[in-house]
Amino acid sequence: RSMLDDVSSLHFATKFDANENLSIGLARYNQAGASHNYQGAGSPLPGFSAVGPSTELSINALAVLGRYSMDDFSAIGGIKISTVADATADIFKLSGAATAASIEGGSDTGLVAGVAYEKPEIALRVELVYETEASFSLPTTGGLLGAATANTTASVPDYRTLNFQSGIAEDTLLYGSIRQADWSNHQVAVAPQTQAAPTSDFSDSTTYTIGVGRKISDQWSITASYKTEEATENTGTSLLSPTDGYEAIGAAAIYTLENGTEITVGVNYSMVGDKTVTSSGVSGLYSDNTVVTSGIKVAYNF
């Protein structure tokens, strides 16, 4: 059985044109999270099946964005509220804790800014977006704290994303993105640990995506994509960071109804990078692991 639990999330977004130059949008989505359960999972670390860590953490974002167009150029700006849901972290059994740490949720507000260039006659769009970091200080009880209270610290890094798309033939679109985040400076430290000895062991990431879309008919379109995140650290010390980069392939089909509603069904297959984790004096190799994700999107244009 996998030490990674199944995860489901619900996203929504809406956009409307205030006038011919200004558009306003609202989006809610899952920004980050961790869902691990080594207990009974057959961990490669000897003896950890009974006392290994179990965590459940989710960070959701609510973004309000505006876009102002000036001929072929546009400016993007807005705010993003990142919220950590109430969480649990059963990670101190090896240190003698009888209960899991209970972490109270919290939120932080950041900014989003970007610019874009468009050439509609060839479906060209190039967009550069910057998102500021979010930091959290979350009251925590249980675990090694017992009835006492201390703060768990966590943060989500600033993101720099370059998106592009362009028509390359009739009814055929090439698209892609590059996304960077300095995760090495944004660790999770479940109280009573500190950022000097964090719970996590995240590494900086650069993610590349390339894909192609094809319109088959007035009703049907298909897409295929390849995504990769560079491997940076094939060894680590945190059981919450058991992978090192990944490669993924994805495919989707889009069906458009007569009223303009679009229904998209997609699947993604990821091959995550191998990593050796050393914790409490023993080492385990995580290798040949895969992740399958699927999703359904419904969009209505009016």
Regions flagged by a language model, labelled:
Residues R1-D5:
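Surface-exposed strand-loop-strand hairpins of Gram-negative outer-membrane beta-barrel proteins
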